[in-house]
Amino acid sequence: MAPSAVNKQPWKFVIVRSEEAKAKLQLAYDREWFHTAPLYIVCLKDNSACWTRSYDSKAHGDIDVAIATEHLCLAATERGLGTCWVCNFDPAVMRELFPEPNLEAVAIIPIGHIAPDCPRNEKRRKGMEEILSEK
């Protein structure tokens, strides 16, 4: 699916499709547009499976889950579906919905077909000269 530090694969993905489960998940992020998705994928990190860099004890679980999640989003986009990273959720609600020890929600990805009348928010992207340097 995606690379991870030392191939630990510290992730779990939960597809949320039933109306009952979607209603509970929507309590974690109460935005009107979010409620219109036909399904969600909850991206979880298994804190017990994360690789930790020995030099400074930096755990790489968030990075690994982010890489796998973006692979998922790119695959959905390739199939004509719309996705959006949602990280501004209520962590207390997510812990209640996913109480497994060592699991922590990293992102919620709503997935669906983009409405034809959906406004496109063109964003200014930094130019290469702003983000790239050479030494």
Language model features with spans:
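Structural motif
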Residues: 38-40, 83, 104-106
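Arginine/glycine-rich "motif VI" loop of SF2 helicases in the C-terminal RecA-like domain
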Residues: 5, 78, 101-102
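Glycine/small-residue-rich phosphate/adenosyl-binding loop
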Residues: 5-68
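C-terminal helix-cap and adjacent tail motif
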Residues: 107-135
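Short active-site-adjacent structural elements
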Residues: 50-51, 93-96, 116-120
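Short secondary-structure boundary segments
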Residues: 45, 88, 113
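Short, electropositive alpha-helical surface patch
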Residues: 93-109
